[in-house]
């Protein structure tokens, strides 16, 4: 299961993480976001020792998405050593996400 991150826990969970972090920015009303859930869950299990995978509900946590300029969801961001490394927007296939993550970290 993928853990949630909030505006208040973002710095500690993401920016100060020893592992690279993938954050899935989503909303309850977003159809493509719901389609991405099982893919994100599988990636989290497969990469559990290499990458921390988190989800952020943008309706419940508007500050962080605004700071990172998120205008469309789902948006997936990769962070490493406290810095944003790369971004993917829209529904993604598992294999393309895995390739992207492995190249980015």
Curated annotation (Swiss-Prot):
Top-level taxon in the UniProt lineage: Bacteria
CDD domains attached to this UniProt entry: TRX_family (cd02947)
Keyword list, A-Z: Disulfide bond, Electron transport, Redox-active center, Transport
Organism expressing this protein natively: Rickettsia prowazekii (strain Madrid E)
GO CC term, one of those recorded: cytoplasm
Cross-referenced Gene3D superfamilies: Glutaredoxin (3.40.30.10)
Positions of the Thioredoxin domain: 1-105
Function: Component of the thioredoxin-thioredoxin reductase system. Participates in various redox reactions through the reversible oxidation of its active center dithiol to a disulfide and catalyzes dithiol-disulfide exchange reactions.
Gene Ontology molecular-function annotations: protein-disulfide reductase activity
Disulphide connectivity of cysteines: 30-33
Cell membrane among keywords: no
Family: Belongs to the thioredoxin family.
Protein name, as recorded: Thioredoxin
